[in-house]
Amino acid sequence: ASNPNRGFVPPVTVGYKETEALGQDLTKAAQCMADAGYTEKNADGFYVNADGETCAFTLTCNAGKEAHVGYAELVKTQLEQFGIQVDLETLDGDSYNAKTSNKFSENNITMEAAIYGYTAAGMGMKNGLASIYVDGTHPVQGGCQVFDEEFQAILSAMGEAKTVEEYTAAAGSLQDWYAAHMPLIALYWDSQILVHSAAYENFTVDAVFGLNNANTWFSITAK
């Protein structure tokens, strides 16, 4: 695993563009809180505003995915150490989907924030770059509920691309948009080890199918 960027998608993605790496800066974070009106903390160590209201949010996760519960607990621990209260909402699979998916909520997503398990296939669907999870108009996913006109224009440019160069340019714009607005945050970038015969080289790596994909048969050569 490796440290992700603000642009969310990992380097193996077609159209990847390097953006600022994520990191922890508690001084900068405290300044952001102050800019938002949170300068004091209560007896429990949580930030409060001028009206005495605690800075808090609910983090939803799927109880059926043990690793996701662990991620949620880690996020809660780190944010509460800093001063933001996190209320964990651990739901069964059906209840989780009903709060986080357009399809299963009948276009009424109600979660504040959630731990999502994005798949390699989902990352590449439609216009790619995890856009189905961000796009509020997507009929199935759309968890981030983004309806921004600039975002939609970028998706259109990606969908209308006729060449790899055109797609890469639009994909770069999307990653810049992710970096600027951060509708979603990657907790880490995963990694894989793919084994192959030493007699061959020039494999094409696919995020979904690994080395065994159609493009490999056009690129592979014997040593």
List where the protein language model places each region.
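Short, well-ordered beta-strand elements
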Residues: 54-63, 86-89
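Structural transition elements
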Residues: 3-42, 62-70
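Periplasmic binding protein-like
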Residues: 80-135
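Sec-exported extracytoplasmic/periplasmic mature domains
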Residues: 1-2, 14, 34-39, 76-84, ...
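Short, well-ordered beta-strand segments
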Residues: 58-60, 114, 188
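Solvent-exposed loop/turn segments at secondary-structure junctions
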Residues: 1-4, 13-16, 63-67, 93-95, ...
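Short, solvent-exposed loop/beta-turn-alpha elements that line the ligand-binding surface or hinge
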Residues: 14-31, 41-55, 101-109, 127-160, ...
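Stable alpha-helical elements in mature extracytoplasmic
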Residues: 1, 5, 25-32, 67-78, ...
